[in-house]
Amino acid sequence: MIENLRNIAIIAHVDHGKTTLVDCLLQQSGTLDRKSQGAERIMDSNDQERERGITILAKNTAIKWNDYRINIVDTPGHADFGGEVERVLSMVDSVLLIVDAVDGPMPQTRFVTSKAFERGLNPIVVVNKIDRPGARPDWVIDQVFDLFDSLGATDEQLDFPIMYASALNGIAGEDPDSMSDDMEPLFQMIVDHVSAPEVNSDGPFQMQISALDYNSYVGVIGVGRITRGKLSPNTQVSVVDRDSSSRNGKILQVMGYHGLERIEVETAEAGDIVCVTGIDALNISDTLCDPAAAEPLPPLSVDEPTVSMTFQVNDSPFAGLEGKFVTSRNIKERLDRELIHNVALRVEQGDSPDKFVVSGRGELHLSVLIESMRREGFELGVSRPEVIQKEIDGQLCEPYEQLVIDCESEHQGGVMEELGQRRAEMKNMVQDASGRVRLEFIVPARGLIGFRSMFMTLTSGSGIMTHVFDHYGPVSKAELAQRNNGVLVSMVKGKTLAYALYSLQDRGRLFIEANVEVYEGQIMGLHSRSNDLVVNPTKAKQLTNVRASGTDEALILTPPVLHTLEQALEFIDSDELVEVTPDSIRLRKKLLLEHERKRASR
């Protein structure tokens, strides 16, 4: 049985098609029955994953092919969710690296691949989207080889097998010019090149928890790979945590995977990936073992967070009108619940009881959490993201990121000038025949805060940017570019009127339309100059009986700029907050009253 088991993780850059490939493998192996074949990207089960088109949580699935059972784990491509990636690699024996046939390997591919090499895993390279116009498989393979070499791969890792595929059409082959009609060659390659798990199924039971799930019916569900022995339901075990203290527990159910379903099994043996229930207060990296032989496995390590934000109770005049959960106790309980399964997150008490400093791997990591809370009915105020500085050998250091930009060559000058002001250092520049250019930079992480929205404007929306944590380096003394413009701030509480907004739109770009309730201290728009301007958006036209009716001109308002959550977080300055409620995202000053702001600025 164990010889026919294969555990493999899938690595790919965002949008290179790994989730589509898994769907294709599930369907062609006959693991999925007809009823669930309709949905696309079956693996991305969470709402936000479908909307953003990214994978956030690592997922497991099992495929039966001929007599083999292949456990496949889908990993997130974003470095922001690197906490997920590192744990997943502890469960597998090889990785499937998926690369786009046009783009080649991108920085996030680099991040996950380096983690795989650290664990000594041998990759299989799949060049996907081979049917795209402009596919250049030979160039991509050279790039992959250079990438592996620069990451210090061994000779064995550099001698990687290559498969060409188009997941959308469901075909694969070892030669891009002669593809087979289905995914058979890929299944065969996985079976031939991935070794069966090297485990001892006769010794005392031992497994490490590498992911957690929660179900209100059975409580906490631990997911992990059995490293030794066998496991059946209703077994007594010892739970050893990362501080080596142990306690006893009893496993109630043991579940294996079949396709995307979890099915209860009577017995599971070493090498298989299973879920267990019945043990309270499980943590990631706990070891479950036979009480007679309680040996903990080494704890899993996760990279440190690099970005922090303050979450606070919403104290605006509109607090509590839209959300269900508004108190600091609600927010604290929700953050504590998130900490159980979101390993890369840290939460500390802020400088007052209703503030919490939440640190994560990047802006995306935290904005996904805020968006989830918003949908659950929470209201909160969120401050601008800040980078976390560390002291290394007596010197203050800050995180630096590797940034890769793909844009039209006509936009190159503007992008480079903007990055120059943000203290970016250019490492490489490659032009391709189609008039696009790829730029690589090393840039301080705080220089990237707020850059994405700027970048989209500079490249008219046609640029692609990706970045990943590179290293901690000395803090750069120079000032980084900040937002140049001030904002328009409301001086009164009330309903906005078209008459007032019409005269304000010459002063800058508005964020709010007519007939919307606003409050004093709320940000109405971006001022065209560098100072903040206090305005009255509720001013009505003075009516007199002198004028004849019908002489008023029609007021034409420019449509307002509406921010998404990420854009709002990037836009605000250090004295501003984003007010997040289930129905709206508002920008506001930390101090709502003008005389308080004046006093604070002295």
Where do the protein language model's features map onto the residues?
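Structural and coupling elements of P-loop NTPases
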Residues: M1-R602
